[in-house]
A protein has these predicted regions:
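An acidic/histidine-cluster motif and surrounding catalytic segment
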Residues: 1-84, 88-237
């Protein structure tokens, strides 16, 4: 499987940090992604990639389309891939453990969340058809932060993923890419529920929020504990 990480040309320090912290993972390929400065929203609307009602910021548009372009690559070439944000830190045994996890899943899996931003809530079908779990991995208490994960071996379990509005690293299959492209495009500010049900909902402002609406309808999974984690000291793009 290809392993892509998204990092813009302007983020040279981020790219250097990513490659240094994740040097233990072979064959990582940088994906430049969509440039915020060169983003033509009107042209994207004409291509039916963005709706007129979408409230995303230019940076959120660029980040979303960077992921969507990789999904298109996966769907076109019918080859699953890993995709990471430019601030992701992968565990020391990511290669072996991710391979083991994928081999343990049904062959028709669509999406596997390796990790997200510490503190972000996720909901899992932890006892399928019986009980849900809602929680969050708290920010690292190590002085080194998420960087310490790069030297840590992790043994994980995959559970059906119901929702999360944060994505740091994931595997996506051709069927998953096709389903998410159809579900999330054109980008629009559909109302998404708040993490606290009592707070109602708000218009989506990121691709991750749109993706969260559809995990429960596809064969999506999340790993606990996570195999990667967002480095809070570094922005995603």
């Amino acid at each position: 499987m290809f392993k892509f990480f998204i990092s813009s040309d302007a983020a040279t320090e981020q790219t250097e940090r990513f490659t240094r912290l994740n040097a233990h993972v072979p064959d990582l390929v940088r994906s430049v992604g969509v440039d915020v400065q060169g983003l033509d929203v009107q042209a994207m609307q004409q291509m039916n990639l963005i709706s007129a009602e979408c409230l995303f910021t230019p940076a959120a548009f660029a980040q979303a389309l960077s992921h969507v372009s990789l999904w298109g690559n996966v769907a076109q070439h019918q080859t699953a891939a890993h995709v990471f944000a430019g601030n992701a830190v992968l565990c020391a045994n990511f290669e072996a453990e991710s391979t083991r996890i994928l081999a343990s899943l049904p062959q028709d899996w669509d999406f596997v969340l390796w990790g997200n931003t510490p503190g972000a809530t996720l909901q899992l079908d932890i006892l399928p058809d019986l009980a849900l779990f809602t929680g969050a991995v708290q920010p690292p208490y190590s002085a080194r932060g998420a960087a310490a994960l790069s030297e840590m071996d992790v043994t994980s379990l995959a559970f059906p993923l119901m929702s999360t509005q944060s994505v740091c690293g994931y595997a996506i299959s051709p069927s998953g890419a096709d389903k998410l492209i159809k579900a999330c495009l054109p980008l629009t500010s559909t109302t998404v529920p708040a993490a606290n049900p009592h707070e109602g909902g708000a218009p989506a402002q990121t691709l991750e929020q749109l993706m969260s609406l559809h995990y429960s309808t596809i064969k999506a999974y999340a790993c606990v504990p996570p195999l990667c984690m967002a480095d809070a000291a570094v922005p995603a793009l």
